[in-house]
Amino acid sequence: QILGRPRLGFLVSAGNMDSMVNHYSVSKKRRKEDSYTPGGVMGKRPDYAVVVYCNLIRSAYKDVPIIAGGIEASLRRLAHYDYWSNKMKRSILLDAQADIISYGMGEHSIVELADALDSGLDIKDITFIDGTVYKTKSLESVYDYKLLPDYTELLEDKKRYAESFFVQYSNTDPFSGKRLVEPYEGKVYVVQNPPAKPLTQDEMDDVYALPYMRSY
């Protein structure tokens, strides 16, 4: 609430590294330093930061669009095995109560999302942007997709999870990747649109011509 109500929506990221990888070693011991915080101070962000941040925003603003992005949201966009808790977890979209995930680099999708919101479209109607993931209770308007195993199947059978992951991995190409649908007991569906197209040479030149701050 200190930030105030945004004009278009909240964009949420855990930073340039998954918060759990940032906080813990592979042996699950707490790290002593945070390389991505000024002074290397640990404890400046919570575990599972995207989930925490989004839920805090949702408790303060019930109807403001929340768009999650960055590596933490991207790698957890569909059901996934969480090494830290040794459990199969749902799409972060559901646990975070976010509206949309912008996955991957996001240079195109974030602009398209902003333009769509600025035009007055409701966040629930923005289902057509490549490089995004959204949730829906009906598949009536979803087309040309591959259906992944239901989340309940993944909990019960490791082989079904392996099959699901193979389909996901096989559809990461921006030119041939299909839309993927992951059901959750038939009550809600998480829909992953195909990956966003890569930047053109001119777009790439524009990005790297920006005045980035260097520390070396």
Predicted regions and their residues:
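Glycine-rich beta-alpha loop elements in corrinoid/cobalamin-binding modules
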Residues: 2-185
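N-terminal [4Fe-4S]-dependent radical SAM core
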Residues: 166-216
